[in-house]
Amino acid sequence: MRAWHFSENAYPFLPPAEQYDSIRVTLPNRLYDPKKGAELYDRFLREWQIAEEEGVNIMLNEHHQTATCVDPAAPLVLAALARMTHKARLLILGNPVANRRQPVRVAEEMALIDVLSKGRLEAGFVRGVPTEILPANSNPVRMNERHWEALDLIVQAWTSNDGPTSFEGRFFHHRNINIWPRPYQSPHPPVWVSTTSAGGAAQVGAHGYIQATFLTGFKGTPAIYDSYRKGWRQAGKSADVPVNRLAYAAMVYVADNDAKARAGAEKLLWYVTANKVSPWFRNPPGYSPVAANVQMMLGDAAGGGFGNFGGNLTVDAAVANGTMFYGTPDKVFEQIKTFYHHVGGFGNLLLMGQAGHLDHDETVLGIRTFAREVYPRLKEEFPDNAISGRGATSAAATR
């Protein structure tokens, strides 16, 4: 199993939630103090360096017009990390290509970072959450189709090495593609795609890309991974799906005693409890298929999922639903082990190890305790060459 330290680079110094309508899209940027923001970036970058020092890989992502993730140009930060680090794999998850007008530019950015890092890039792509539509001045209709067409164009740009080539799609048209530099890795960096739906996972599996899912827990993750495996096999990849093709993101905090661990986990939970979003930004018309809208409505009505992505969620409830792992090293190892077997195995653990008011020392404690006391056991227990899906049924049936 590979582990990746992940922070959304949040800006938590906000007034009480009652004083604003939404933390995303419309929150006035007069609330952002650039001096405090600069200090935050200094510490976030240092925490990624510490993760590398402890043998943990690095992950970052991109969002727009929100205090929950002040990283609107993730490739810039990734380029800085390419020069500030030396051995960690660098995952961006990811590029919101359905909202980018020029996929070839994304191909160039990723190729350049791959060269700067001497082949350590893991290039991830995301459809983008609904709250990204307005900031991108984008159209939510046919977003998924744009996403996949853009990714096809990017891969073509990376792998066409004999002079200009052209691309004629439904949404993108390019007559002279000939990027310099080309990627350091051949034929191109590993490709990741994130999705939280079974339908999306089947497409990722059919392409053979690495599938990541975020905070889908005990309830949602098995169907997503099953769909990935089905798509993989139907595309003729192989009968067996390696666990290293699957990734899971969760909030993770580890400390040497229960009191410290719980205190850190409570602060980490800010990521979901502070995420106040106006209803009209959460599901713009055309973003989701009708069937998905029905399921979301049923889920909210039944108390499933996060509803308004957090609300009154507690750390104990988050552990119970599989969106958080926290505690002493022994407890966290057992929590991850239980989840691993329930979902049929995964080879990449994306650790949201910093959020909200979790300070630098607390974040570093969590990184180091995980890296030294939990990660070696995970690597021994769950080898990268394991096969996903074996034993999943019996494990799931015990819950």
What are these regions (language model features)?
Residues S197-G220, I224:
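A conserved active-site cap/scaffold subdomain adjacent to cofactor or substrate pockets
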